């Protein structure tokens, strides 16, 4: 036995075994990865080895003390990566990417969120390191570097494992690396650590795209957006011409709370009533990615899709954009954003200059006291009340944007502000969520009253829009309880990406309200609002279309490649009936829309990575 690889390299073998087990345990318990087949389970089991084996194998080139130090450090680093991804996944249902690391400035404002997601059991992931340290102290014996033939055999096996992983990935999802909008599929197929390497390479390629871009790069994109343009409904074009715009972004607000009750009390009584006097959209989807609220701002302003990795507000703040703010400025509109948080959060102070916004009211412009604030900033009621007074001083017409805060993860609220009982389910987060949504709804009601008091209501177009989901897939069991379902399917998860979108034009929509049932998303907001203001968008490079146009093809694509039409929902490589939620026998029915979804996301990425709008007037 003395000549065996295990006997000579016990510390290495134990290090590999423990790291393999830890990674697989995190796959199963830390992430909500959908495993449908035995092949997918096999891939999940073996893919950690295709990274751990070659990395830890470096220890074969080192003598005993250096080898053990290297393996312990490698184990520690990979464990930290696992825990960091688990915490990140707990909120975003996503994995850390390189651009996210440049958002470290946000962490100072996220203390309560990280605390909510950190689990004491994470400490158990370091137990193997303690064992390895004790093992190293008790089993010291002279050791030289491994023989060349041993290293060759070891790396031959490592290469075989890597090739096996890639082959299985290709069988499961052909051309996976070429069409990588779905990070979950990448992690399931090639592994978490390998995904981080792939992401690093992708970001390097994206950075180089800007250097090699030229004026010809924008031509194909112009041709696509011009061909996809939908003419506005002339009966609605210019309905709000000359009016002020008051656009309120509703933090973490999803549509499933609308017209729902807890213990007989409505969660959103004000919005429920306002919908009856407005243009509202039943199948309106959030399309954000890792930038969350900042992504929703970006999408609305530009009618482009956000970056697949990181937040555009951080990674592309030096690029050129043809925002709605700039377009409306040509029609004498003054623009302002109100947000009672620090101006540097999400790099807003820099990006708002890039967007052409005239004025940014941040936390320093508001009167904030311990009693009127939360961990994220000023409470919604006080924020909107103070904002209404500031709004009156702006030059008119104006386009104003407000970003609420109280309904923010982890959805905590003072007892004095609680207007409804918590929901009763297996998720404390969902239980609290209904109370912060209820408070937000009451704050909106109060805001409308203040607008009337300030004389700003009648001559304005008032818009409410949810920015992104608040309750992630990690709480699907409780969500099924809320919705009265046995389980939440992938189809249901897509439906839960619906957010409120309400356009209220006093004197018009209260006389002729309308509920639009067609599929649409945040990318459609820019042309919809511009056309209501009487500003034509034909010729603009935008991927959205006027939601009120009868010429529009109902369609919404999420950033991960899932999409929705009036007939189909496509997600997790499966085509569903939009009406029934059942898996379709004819899976090819979704193919034409899948091509459209991939093309739009790819073209939008080219604009962002190449800074192509600098070549367009």
UniProtKB/Swiss-Prot annotation:
Proteolytically cleaved. GO terms for molecular function: metal ion binding; transferase activity. It is a multi-pass membrane protein. The record marks 213-214 as: Cleavage. It is found in: Cell membrane. GO terms for cellular component: extracellular region; membrane; plasma membrane. The keyword Metal-binding applies. Pfam families: Sulfatase. Mn(2+) binds at residues 251, 293, 467-468. Gene3D superfamilies: 3.30.1120.170, Alkaline Phosphatase, subunit A. The active site is at 293. Substrate binds at residue 408. Keywords: Cell membrane, Manganese, Membrane, Metal-binding, Secreted, Transmembrane, Transmembrane helix. Residues 32-41, 90-115, 172-617 are extracellular. Residues 1-10, 63-68, 137-153 are cytoplasmic. The keyword Lipoprotein does not apply. The chain crosses the membrane at residues 11-31, 42-62, 69-89, 116-136, 154-171. Belongs to the LTA synthase family. Although its sequence similarity with the glycerol phosphate lipoteichoic acid synthase LtaS, it cannot restore staphylococcal growth and LTA synthesis after ltaS depletion. This is Lipoteichoic acid synthase-like YvgJ. The gene is yvgJ.
